[in-house]
């Protein structure tokens, strides 16, 4: 029998969409059934090992793409999150990049859109500092974050009003247990810092709250 001849192709028992391929009576590799038909692989066919390696690479890509699509099925993800997930599955960087390009092409991943939705979901509860930090951890580019946050500047009434509500609610809660204004101010400042508001934003809202509650 000639060298590098396919001697058997058998369906896997547990994964019906995959087959095992034997070369010269020895197991060689497994792949998606679709690739068998695409490349015309069949028993008795003589194959080049480099060509088989290309098929294996293509199979790895299809599997990686399938894993990525499953990962983003229920919730929107960033490119970084998808890359991390695929690296955990030990796919190589070339395949990961191909998957990311596919996801971008069909709008399955869009970091700009992700940042926009992330901000809208949190802007009434958190400050821009915390939101930006959260997006950086998600792998969003600084330029995208700054662009999306720019609309929530210090003169954005909706942003400021949301901060006032957060601050006033906490102020009333602290004031029930504490009468010393300095201690109230310190506790409220610490709380607002933890929520991601800047010192300048905190200073303005504290000035308003304490002037209204003298």
UniProtKB/Swiss-Prot annotation:
Q: Which InterPro entries does this chain map to?
A: RecX_HTH_1st (IPR053926), RecX_HTH_2nd (IPR053924), RecX_HTH_3rd (IPR053925), Regulatory_RecX (IPR003783), WH-like_DNA-bd_sf (IPR036388)
- Enumerate the Gene Ontology biological process terms: regulation of DNA repair
Specify the domain of life of the species encoding this protein. Bacteria
Keywords on record = Cytoplasm
Cell compartments where the protein resides: Cytoplasm
Q: What does this protein do?
A: Modulates RecA activity.
What does the similarity note say?
Belongs to the RecX family.
* The protein's name: Regulatory protein RecX
Species per Swiss-Prot/TrEMBL record: Clostridium acetobutylicum (strain ATCC 824 / DSM 792 / JCM 1419 / IAM 19013 / LMG 5710 / NBRC 13948 / NRRL B-527 / VKM B-1787 / 2291 / W)
Q: Which gene encodes it?
A: recX
């Amino acid at each position: 029998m000639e060298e590098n001849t396919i001697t058997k192709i058998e369906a896997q028992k547990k994964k019906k969409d995959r087959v095992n391929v034997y070369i010269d009576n020895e197991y060689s590799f497994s792949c998606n059934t679709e690739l068998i038909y695409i490349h015309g692989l069949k028993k008795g066919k003589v194959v080049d090992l480099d060509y088989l390696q290309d098929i294996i690479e293509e199979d790895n890509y299809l599997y990686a793409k399938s894993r990525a699509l499953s990962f983003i099925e229920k919730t929107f993800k960033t490119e970084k999150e998808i890359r991390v997930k695929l690296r955990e599955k030990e796919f190589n960087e070339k395949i990961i990049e191909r998957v990311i390009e596919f996801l971008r092409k069909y709008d399955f991943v869009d970091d700009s859109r992700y940042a926009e939705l992330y901000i809208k979901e949190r802007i009434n509860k958190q400050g821009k500092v915390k939101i930006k930090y959260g997006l950086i951890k998600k792998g969003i580019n600084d330029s995208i974050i700054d662009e999306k946050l720019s609309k929530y500047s210090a003169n954005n009434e909706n942003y400021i009003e949301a901060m006032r509500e957060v601050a006033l609610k906490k102020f009333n809660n602290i004031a029930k247990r504490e009468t010393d204004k300095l201690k109230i101010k310190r506790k409220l400042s610490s709380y607002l810092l933890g929520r991601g508001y800047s010192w300048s934003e905190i200073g303005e809202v504290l000035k308003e709250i304490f002037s209204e509650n003298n």
